[in-house]
From Swiss-Prot:
Tryptophyl-tyrosyl-methioninium (Trp-Tyr) (with M-255) crosslink site(s): W107-Y229
Annotated site, Transition state stabilizer, chain positions: R104
Keywords in alphabetical order: Heme, Hydrogen peroxide, Iron, Metal-binding, Oxidoreductase, Peroxidase, Signal
Species per Swiss-Prot/TrEMBL record: Legionella pneumophila (strain Lens)
Catalysed reactions, as listed in the record: H2O2 + AH2 = A + 2 H2O; 2 H2O2 = O2 + 2 H2O
Organism placement in taxonomy: Bacteria, Pseudomonadati, Pseudomonadota, Gammaproteobacteria, Legionellales
The protein's name in its UniProt record: Catalase-peroxidase 2
Length: 749
């Protein structure tokens, strides 16, 4: 079931030792039972209702971009640098420097990003809320955020928590001698927790998320419940570096990192700081969400010794990787390859590794006592970089070529903390690097004169007279725009990547039909552009959307309504060279209920996948409902199947879908021939009238969806249906147009 959940994971492999974290049970027996408890198979619509706009205390008119652009970013950076070395008695800084703590905080904020659904990442600042704020892997990051509060308090609405959590780690690296390639603001704060599928385990640090061949279930990225990436002691606590390498490769890959980026991130990240395991985890109190109210949001209260400083317990692992924990160096790679490592246990009982050579026992300074020295440590996941043949080759190259390593780490770090932000057009601030990177899904700038209203009307006429049908035009526009994901702002119609690999070959897009439509539209585009004397052009990306709009206007006219579907030109056409095929493969729809398409490899039901798709498109329950109803009567199903086309006038935009679905003249039965298909029979004659999928019938079966369907099936709802359909359509068509605000339709009956 889709249970208001969504996965995310990452590991600044400062990770967590499962042996030190007790499971805190939450008694539920005395809690009122939810509808989901009583009826667990009930379709959960809550993903379409979060976040709730009324939760935002800043109000609907608040413009974060304007506030951030008025911020003195250099002043914030200077304040952060001062904070780094101003140790507080209530949480003393290791080596007198909070920099490594802030790097871990930033990493764990951004590193929850995952490629398969774009969920996770630093946007929203969700590390402040449950469950992230209480994950075992995020132990003591509550202190890092509290250290930042005076700066957040000083600059207020001009910098979000989401941006500050990332900026702090970036500044920390710069202050400790590493040159980053920049920073972009633009992450807006969330004001409430959202429910995401982090896995189905019922206990922290369990791992029951592998399929039959041992791969992580999609869309999950972390291997263990409550960890960002992987268990640093090795899979299931077994200290096997090669097995750890397999898990690292899988989970970092699901965070959009290749092998080189993975090695750079681990080797670069572990150049700073230390792990903390002064004693057993039995001394730790509950995580923030389970702690007493008097703790005021702090968790993991430590009863061992002073409970802080030298007595800190975080992961259960203990020690630093390098001789310069607060200064950038290449000592991590030097130590990794120069020593033979032997297995040992930390004071907290976690498995880790130290040099076989006893002469290394005094290399590393103590974090608090200048008279003490220690041996460097490595974790099982660190040794993966030495023993995995692919990782080892990369790591040795970095060791021999320090400048190449510096550049690789800077780029991988920038990608890590910006991957969930979408295109560069959303980046804010003076520190944005000028270089365009392929993972940003670039599109060309508009370097030509855009079409005007007369041109648009002329082009719509040519499209409608081209021989292309309403379903073909609607399906093509939908296929192009509906790749958008509001989670990581990827996809959408801009770029016209539907004509490029891999999108042109996706089964959901009816490749043969799509090729025919694109060929016709390209001909119209070329004829128009070649006829212009003033440099005016229309992009194929714009023409695809315009074609869908024109078809909808024609379909509404057939129903007796004259409408103008709002259209704003300005999209451009990306090239294949601007498109990372592998990166775009994860956007392929394995189900699209709006087109009645479903790949049976999915582990969720078709209605659940519809809700997930609508959630990614940032649609509400009514918007999802009206779009499905409209797409059905427009005959826009994949493969030209007729499931759910409850009308005798396909291609006409009307509310027939809802009227016929809710009619008691039809009796529905499961098909005896095709699994997942339902047949609707006339109650009086017994004649077969309709065929449908569970996506179609859910709008009559689910009580909440039925209520919305009824609103569109009433005699006085015809105008409203068309108005709402067009508005929802435009919302999808412009979802990736961060430069405009969607307009509402004009309708005359």
């Amino acid at each position: 079931m889709f249970k208001r959940t969504i996965p995310l994971f990452a590991a600044f492999t400062l990770a967590i030792s499962p042996s030190i974290f007790p499971n805190y049970a939450h008694a539920q027996e005395d809690k009122p039972k939810t509808n989901q408890y009583w009826w667990p198979k009930m379709l959960d619509l809550s993903p379409l209702r979060q976040p709730n706009a009324t939760s935002n205390p800043m109000g609907e008119k608040f413009n974060y971009a304007e506030e951030f652009n008025s911020l003195d970013l250099n002043a914030v950076i200077e304040d952060l640098k001062k904070l780094m070395t101003t140790s507080q008695d209530w949480w003393p800084a290791d080596y007198g420097n909070y920099g490594p703590l802030f790097i871990r905080m930033s990493w764990h904020a951004a590193g929850t990003y995952r490629i398969y659904d774009g969920r996770g990442g630093a946007n929203g600042g969700f590390q402040r809320f449950a469950p992230q704020n209480s994950w075992p892997d995020n132990a003591n990051l509550d202190k890092a955020r509290r250290l930042l509060w005076p700066i957040k308090q000083k600059y207020g609405r001009k910098i979000s928590w989401a941006d500050l959590l990332v900026l702090a780690g970036n500044v920390a690296m710069e202050s400790m001698g590493f040159k980053t390639i920049g920073f972009a603001g633009g992450r807006e704060d969330a004001w409430e927790a959202i429910n995401i599928n982090w896995g189905t385990e019922g206990k922290w640090l369990e791992s029951k998320r592998q399929d039959k061949v041992g791969k992580l279930e999609k869309p999950l990225a972390a291997t263990v419940m409550g960890l960002i990436y992987v268990n640093p002691e090795g899979p299931n606590g077994v200290p096997d570096p090669l097995a750890a390498a397999e898990k690292i490769r899988e989970t970092f890959g699901r965070m959009a990192m290749n092998d080189e980026e993975t090695v750079a991130l681990i080797a670069g990240g572990h150049a700073f700081g230390k792990t903390h395991g002064a004693a057993s985890g039995k001394y730790l109190g509950p995580a923030p969400e389970a702690a007493g109210i008097e703790e005021q949001g702090f968790g993991w209260k430590n009863s061992y010794g002073s409970g802080k400083g030298k007595d800190t317990i975080t992961s259960g692992l203990e020690g630093a990787w390098t001789v310069t924990p607060t200064h950038w160096s290449h000592n991590y790679l030097q130590n990794l390859f120069n020593f033979n490592w032997v297995k040992t246990k930390s004071p907290g009982g976690a498995i880790q590794w130290v040099p076989e050579n006893s002469n290394a026992s005094s290399m590393v300074p103590d974090a608090f006592d200048p008279s003490k020295r220690h041996a460097p440590v490595m974790l099982t996941t660190d040794l993966a970089l030495k023993f995995d043949p692919v990782y080892s080759k990369i790591a040795k190259r970095f060791l021999d070529n320090p400048k190449e390593f510096d550049d690789a780490f800077a780029r991988a770090w920038f990608k890590l903390i910006h991957r969930d932000m979408g295109p560069r057009s959303r980046y804010l601030g003076s520190l944005v690097p000028k270089e365009i990177m392929i993972w940003q899904d670039p599109v060309p700038p508009v370097d030509y004169k855009l079409v005007d209203a007369n041109d648009i009307a002329n082009l719509k006429g040519k499209i409608l007279n081209s021989g292309l049908t309403t379903p073909e035009l609607v399906k093509t526009a939908w296929a192009s725009a509906s790749t958008f994901r509001g989670t990581d702002m990827r996809g959408g119609a801009n770029g016209a990547r539907i004509r490029l690999a891999p999108q042109k070959d996706w089964p959901a897009n009816d490749p043969q039909e799509l090729a025919k439509v694109l060929k016709t539209l390209e001909s119209i585009q070329n004829n128009f552009n070649n006829a212009q004397a003033d440099g005016k052009k229309i992009s194929l990306a714009d023409l695809i959307v315009l074609g869908g709009n024109a078809a909808i206007e024609q379909a509404a006219k057939q129903a007796g309504y004259d409408i103008i579907v709002p259209f704003t030109p300005g999209r451009t056409d990306a090239t294949q060279g601007m498109t990372d095929v592998k990166s775009f493969e994860v956007l392929e729809p394995k189900a699209d209920g709006f087109r009645n398409y479903f790949d049976k490899s999915n582990n969720m039901s078709p209605p659940e996948m519809l809700v997930d798709k609508a959630s990614l498109l940032k649609l509400s329950v009514p918007e999802m409902t009206v779009l499905v109803g409209g797409m059905r009567v427009l005959n826009a199903n994949t493969g030209q199947n007729q499931y759910g086309v409850f009308t005798d006038k396909p291609g006409t935009l009307n509310n027939d879908f809802f009227i016929n679905l809710l009619s008691m003249s039809t009796e529905w039965k499961k098909s005896s021939e095709t699994e997942g298909i339902y047949e609707g029979y006339d109650r009086k004659t017994g004649k077969l009238k309709w065929k449908a999928t569970s996506v179609d019938l859910i709008f009559g079966a689910n009580s909440e969806l039925r209520a919305v369907a009824e609103a569109y099936a009433t005699d006085d709802a015809k105008d409203k249906f068309i108005q709402d359909f067009v508005n929802a359509w435009v919302k999808v068509m412009t979802a990736d147009r961060f430069d405009i605000k969607a307009a509402n339709a004009n309708i005359n009956s």
